[in-house]
Structure formats: C-alpha cells, structure tokens
C-alpha cells in the first residue's frame, strides 16, 4: 500500500 497504517486500517485497505 502507498501509505502506512497512520490513520485507519480501512483507509490503508481502500488505498
């Protein structure tokens, strides 16, 4: 994934 799990796990999965 482009970004690490800095905010929400869902965000990372979406990206």
Swiss-Prot record:
GO terms for molecular function: retinal binding. The keyword Membrane does not apply. It comes from the Eukaryota. Keywords: Extracellular matrix, Secreted, Transport, Vitamin A. It is found in: Secreted, Extracellular space, Extracellular matrix, Interphotoreceptor matrix. One of its GO terms (cellular component) is interphotoreceptor matrix. IRBP shuttles 11-cis and all trans retinoids between the retinol isomerase in the pigment epithelium and the visual pigments in the photoreceptor cells of the retina. This is Retinol-binding protein 3. It comes from Cricetidae sp. (Hamster).
């Amino acid at each position: 994934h482009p970004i690490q799990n800095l905010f929400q796990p869902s965000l990372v999965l979406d990206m």
